[in-house]
Regions:
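N-terminal Sec signal peptide and the immediately downstream disordered periplasmic leader
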Residues: 2-83, 114, 148-151, 214-215, ...
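Outer-membrane beta-barrel transmembrane domain signature of Gram-negative proteins
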Residues: 346-357, 376, 380, 386-494, ...
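C-terminal beta-signal and adjacent terminal beta-strands/loops
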Residues: 128, 610, 730-737, 758-813
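Transmembrane beta-barrel wall of Gram-negative outer-membrane proteins
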Residues: 188, 201-342, 346-368, 755, ...
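Short acidic/polar hinge/loop motifs at secondary-structure boundaries
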Residues: 123-163
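Extracytoplasmic beta-strand/coil segments of soluble accessory domains associated
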Residues: 83-128
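N-terminal periplasmic accessory domains that precede
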Residues: 78-81, 85, 106, 119, ...
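Gram-negative outer-membrane beta-barrel transporters
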Residues: 599-600, 604-739
Length: 813
């Protein structure tokens, strides 16, 4: 506790130490995180029902990110742009982790993706179909959030990040905060952005083109279209030294895969599109619609499966049976070398589709306003796996499989009404109904079949298909009513109170509340804070989802790992219970300083307590008796499963930390200026009470220290005439990595980005830049993974492919 207090004092001192350097100059800067795009402003949509609230007079912490800031990061996806600009937000880039390679897990203030609610134009987005099984960290494993990467950045007028609990205002999932993507609402004009880039030494060349157009449709209507196409090649490690592959090649064995370690970044091709349209039916009444469609393909290469012992590595694990060993001491049932003489590296792919459509009618004129809307959303992934085998089928096995599909569908009806009693008091109320459907699509027969060689592993190796026992469609319904009062008690004191009652057909009822306030002590200083409760019902994918995958073990081989349906007969073998909702209690307090022209600083402290937190349990080894019990109930591959996991309400947790954001503009002359931006996040995560069964001291330490407590970025952008130069430093504090039962210390690291741009050609902007300009790679992760060719930590907090350079061109019309 004393260390935490000392860090709070340090951050406070840092915030106010910066103030003297800010001389009276200009209004707050157009720095990273401040919206300045046409059609956008720093008037926020989230966190308040008032129409006139900005980021400085809000009662809670909000970041407003401009599209120019997103482009300046050099990233063409929202995930990485937000990770760069908002230290409290992170998005892991994982290597070869099943579905998590396609929909990346995100966190806000250390909380997982399903504690962060994503909105578009202030309306809830549907969840992704993928449940995060392979994140490699206990705090995020098992989450089922929304996919942040299906919207073209060029479609956005701003991104608003509410860093505060908001379940009482927005419903389940808003425990840690809310992110709102506001779409452009122009009546004319448009732009095109193209980028080509590549990693310094890992390949992964990427081509990206985005376009936006506002189609003129009259003075009383708007119609905006945006689209993006991305083509990203695979990125590979610079030096793959898989011990088995080296030995196989030395022995002259043919057919050894070129990249036995798998790839760092996936192959990725995607088309994304968005529309945003509306027409005024009268002076006050507007009919509006918006939505998106995305289709894409992505693939990752898993590590080498050897045909026999080589270089000290055996073919144990998934191929533990001696029938796969080609040594003369063991009789053969099936000679793997007859199919893959040099072993094989399964290619795991997914065809992704995301669609949403919302139609609404609203009256936003006058003291009484209302909004009625209906939305539909769906997210699907169809899996494929090629270059692999179903060992139990022997020589009759195909080498390509379709393991099945996952689909998340949502339908929601929403009604809201607000009334301004006067300039000081706003009343707001609403009701909502949401239906979620989760569909597990059956795989092709060979992907899950147990063939005639019953002592060999069944199903497609690497990712086993969904059998009829696992497939099905599962529904859940929820109803909510909510209300809020926002009042300026005095000219310097604002108070808002919100409440929400929800009824879930599977998880009962809940009432959440929130109170937020702001005291303006002077024109320069304001205090703000909030207290709230939250609620999150388990997602359908967590209640019904299951999988069978091959995982690296501790000595270079593979084992069969099962994720079991909570409370199912198979999970009950290991003591699993049915799931219950999570509840939370949030507190925040902060200060806003705007006393000097061109200077803005906010400092916010927070604490989030979550009870009955839902996690994917750590993998536990099965016993012979447990495997026999699984086989007795005809669980697929029950006799061969070496590890199991399942979702469970594991423990009570506490997240505590602070955010510091400071911006300043220095005007040097009429055509020269520098914008400075500093953003810092400190975040601690702890268990409250005794750890649950299966959480060893090592796993507890990983939960609490497995991600950096410190994250920050500092940027400076200098503009001189038609040229602009941006430099950015991104800092990750020290953390610890669990490798088996051993902790590998990870030192703090700072990455540097740079970009230079030129706007001397009318309506054209050219820029060249580099991320991670010193080409820093994460450290390795243990001897077993080094022997398997994984020379970098595949769960690194800053990626594994090194530096990236790019060229951008933008045309505005």
């Amino acid at each position: 506790m004393s260390k935490f207090v000392s860090r709070l004092l340090l951050s406070s001192a840092l915030a106010f130490a910066m103030a003297p350097v800010a001389q009276a100059q200009t209004p707050p800067p157009e720095a990273e995180g401040v919206d300045t795009d046409e059609g956008g402003s720093d008037i926020v949509v989230i966190g308040t029902r008032r129409k006139d609230r900005s980021i400085t007079d809000s009662s809670v912490a909000i970041d407003v990110i401009s599209p120019e800031s997103i482009t300046a990061t050099g990233y063409t996806d929202v995930n990485d742009a937000l990770r760069t600009l908002v230290p409290a937000f992170n998005a892991q880039r994982l290597q070869g982790n099943d579905g998590s390679s396609f929909v990346r897990p995100v966190t806000l203030r250390g909380s997982p993706a399903d504690h962060v609610l994503l909105l578009m134009n202030g309306k809830r987005r549907h969840r992704a179909s993928i449940v995060q099984i392979g994140t490699g960290h206990a705090s995020t494993s098992g989450s089922q959030g929304q996919d942040f990467n299906v919207i073209p950045p060029i479609a956005l007028s701003s991104v608003e990040v509410l860093r505060d609990g908001a379940s009482a205002q927005y419903g389940s999932d808003a425990i840690a905060g809310v992110i709102n993507m506001e779409l452009k609402k122009q009546k004319s004009g448009g732009s095109i952005i193209g980028q080509v880039g590549e990693y310094f030494s890992s390949g992964g060349r990427t081509y990206d083109i985005q376009g936006h157009i506002a189609v003129p449709v009259g003075d009383n209507a708007y119609f905006n279209l945006a689209a993006q196409y991305t083509d990203q090649a695979k990125a590979y490690a610079r030096k793959a030294t898989h011990a088995g592959a080296v030995a196989l090649r030395a022995a002259g064995v043919p057919g050894v895969p070129e990249h036995p370690e798998g790839n760092l970044d996936p192959r990725y091709m995607a088309f994304k599109s968005v529309w945003n349209a509306g027409i005024e039916l009268s002076d006050a009444l507007e009919l509006y619609t918006f939505g998106n469609y995305m289709t894409g393909k992505s693939s990752v290469t898993f590590g080498l499966r050897q045909p026999f012992a080589a270089g000290g590595l055996s073919g144990h694990g998934t191929y533990a049976n001696s029938a796969f060993d080609l040594s003369p001491a063991h009789p053969q049932q099936f000679n793997l070398a007859s199919v893959y003489p040099g072993g094989f590296t399964p290619e795991f792919g997914g065809h992704l589709e995301d669609f949403s459509a919302l139609v609404g009618l609203r009256d936003q004129d006058g003291p009484l306003t209302w909004d009625l809307s209906a939305r539909y959303g769906t997210n699907t992934v169809d899996y494929t796996i090629t270059g692999t085998i179903n060992a139990s089928m022997g020589v009759n096995s195909p080498t390509s499989f379709k393991p099945g599909s996952l689909t998340q569908r949502e339908i929601q009806f929403d009604g809201e009404i607000s009334y301004e009693l006067n300039d000081q008091i706003l009343l707001f109320a609403g009701a909502s109904h949401r239906k979620e459907t989760y569909v597990i699509g059956e795989g092709d027969l060979a992907s899950y079949l147990t063939g005639p060689l019953r002592d060999l592993p069944a199903g497609s190796n690497g990712f086993q298909g969904f059998s009829p026992e696992f497939a099905g469609s599962f529904d859940s319904n929820s109803y909510a009513v909510f209300a809020e009062v926002d009042a300026d008690i005095t000219p310097w004191w604002n108070l808002s109170v919100a409440g929400r009652y929800e009824d879930y057909d599977q998880f009962g009822t809940n009432f959440s509340y929130k109170a937020a306030t702001r005291f303006e002590l002077s024109d320069a200083f304001a205090l703000r804070g909030s207290v709230s409760t939250g609620f999150r019902a388990p997602a359908a994918g967590q209640v019904f989802g299951t999988s069978l995958t091959s995982q690296l073990d501790g000595i270079g081989g593979f084992i069969l790992d099962a994720v079991l349906v909570p409370g199912s007969p198979a999970a009950q073998v290991f003591g699993s219970d049915a799931l219950t909702p999570e509840t939370s209690f949030n507190m925040s307090a902060g200060v806003v300083f705007t006393g000097l022209d061109g200077f803005l600083t906010t400092l916010d402290f927070y604490q989030i307590d979550v009870d009955d937190r839902l996690l994917l349990t750590p993998s536990r080894n099965t016993t012979a008796a447990e495997r026999a019990a699984l086989a007795a109930i005809n669980f697929p591959n029950g006799a061969d499963i070496q590890q199991v996991r399942y979702f469970q309400n594991e423990m009570n947790t506490r997240v505590r930390g602070f955010d510091l954001v400071s911006t300043y503009r220095q005007e040097w002359s009429d055509n020269a200026s520098t914008d400075f931006s500093l953003a810092l996040n400190y975040n601690e995560q702890h268990l409250r009470g005794a750890p649950p069964p299966g959480f060893s001291p090592a796993i507890v330490t990983e939960f609490e220290r497995g991600t950096p407590r410190w994250r920050g970025n500092f940027s400076a952008t200098t503009k001189v005439g038609d040229f602009a130069l941006m430099g950015r430093a991104i800092h990750y504090g020290a953390w610890r990595r669990l490798d088996g039962a051993t902790f590998l210390p990870r030192k703090a690291v700072t990455l540097f980005d740079a970009e230079i741009s030129y706007t001397g050609i009318q309506d054209v902007e050219l820029s060249v830049g580099a991320r991670n300009i010193f080409n820093i790679f994460p450290p390795g992760r243990g001897a077993a993974r080094a022997r398997a060719g994984l020379i970098y930590d595949n769960h690194s907090v800053f990626g594994v492919a090194g530096g990236f350079y790019y060229l951008n061109a933008k045309y505005k019309f």
